[in-house]
Regions:
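Active/binding-pocket-proximal capping segment
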Residues: 13-23, 67-73, 182-190
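Long mid-to-C-terminal assembly/interaction modules of large eukaryotic proteins
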Residues: 157-272
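Secreted peptidase-domain scaffold signal
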Residues: 90-194
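Extracellular S/T/G-rich loop segment that most often corresponds to the catalytic His/Ser-adjacent loop
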Residues: 1-40, 44
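An often Trp-containing, charged/polar helix-loop segment at the C-terminal end
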Residues: 59-84
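Charged/polar, low-hydrophobicity segments characteristic of intrinsically disordered regions
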Residues: 79-103, 198-216
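C-terminal functional module detector
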Residues: 55-60, 154-155
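Short, small-residue alpha-helix embedded
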Residues: 43-57
Length: 272
């Protein structure tokens, strides 16, 4: 969300108010040089300006990465939390917060630091999600990325609270109109998801959990350990919509020592 002015209300209706609007140049300078504007138009312009600054700072960066950096830098204000996240539960308050305010207000300064000297890792990568075997299409690749954790440093911090945030941004090709909209898998060409290894998993167990292809003959062998889904603030049911997914874990530093691997894998789309 970005500040684009406000409206005045009497409790029953709303109206534009110059004092709460943003100043801009007028389209007809013969009549007047300046005017006011409010709503989504100036908010869109500000978001575009922020994206342009990132492109300028880091030439060659992917558009998907620019979007990810802006979302990754966003934060909900206390007022947003108070109004929309009334019970702080994934199934209600946090869900309502995400639907009403998105991921919050982005910070251009923090977005730039994420590429510069903020503690973050940016990966620009690609995968082939599906392959054809005979007359059917099946899941193909997943990517596994390792965090360069300073394990000793995290261990030395002990119970100090830290936050790990992951943002996945990618391009989808919208479904052609002649395909129709029979179900939720028909609009995106392919969707992606991310998952983080849990403290009680080995790397082999983690691969088995997220990728059926590595399970061998026993396809029900999802490995030992658990997904640790309760660790996430939003949870997969809330974040896994659209083509950008962002979530975070608040944990002690020592508990994150072994959270070194993240998997990015495909799910259904109309390409398949």
């Amino acid at each position: 969300m970005l500040n684009a002015g406000g409206a005045a209300t009497n409790g029953d209706d709303y109206t534009d108010c110059p004092d709460l609007s943003l100043l801009t140049t007028n389209h007809d300078i013969r009549r007047q040089l300046f005017t006011t504007v409010t709503g989504t138009s100036p908010a869109t312009a500000e978001a575009s300006w922020m994206a342009a600054q990132l492109f300028k700072e880091y030439p060659g960066i992917w558009p998907e990465t620019v979007r990810a950096l802006l979302i990754h830098s966003a934060k909900w204000t206390d007022r947003m939390q108070q109004r929309f996240n009334t019970d702080d539960k994934k199934t209600s308050g946090r869900k309502n917060l995400l639907r009403s305010c998105g991921y919050g207000i982005p910070s251009l300064e923090k977005a730039m630091w994420c590429k510069n000297n903020y503690v973050g890792m940016v990966v620009e990568d690609a995968l082939q999600p599906f392959k054809k075997e005979g007359g059917t299409y099946k899941m193909n690749e997943m990517n596994l990325h390792e965090f360069p954790w300073p394990t000793e440093t995290l261990e030395s911090l002990g119970d100090t609270k830290v936050r790990l945030r992951i943002t996945l941004s990618y391009y989808i090709e919208p479904g052609p109109g002649d395909i129709g909209w029979k179900d939720k898998y028909r609009y995106p060409s392919c969707s992606l998801r991310f998952d983080l290894i849990n403290n009680n998993e080995t790397i082999d167990d983690f691969k088995k959990r997220v990728n059926v292809k590595v399970r061998g003959e026993n396809k029900k062998d999802s490995g030992e350990g658990s997904s640790g889904s309760e660790r996430w603030y939003l949870g997969s049911a809330n974040r896994d919509v659209g083509s950008i997914h962002s979530d975070f874990i608040d944990s002690s530093a020592v508990e994150l020592c072994n959270a070194k691997f993240i998997a990015v894998y495909p799910v259904n789309g109309w390409w398949r």
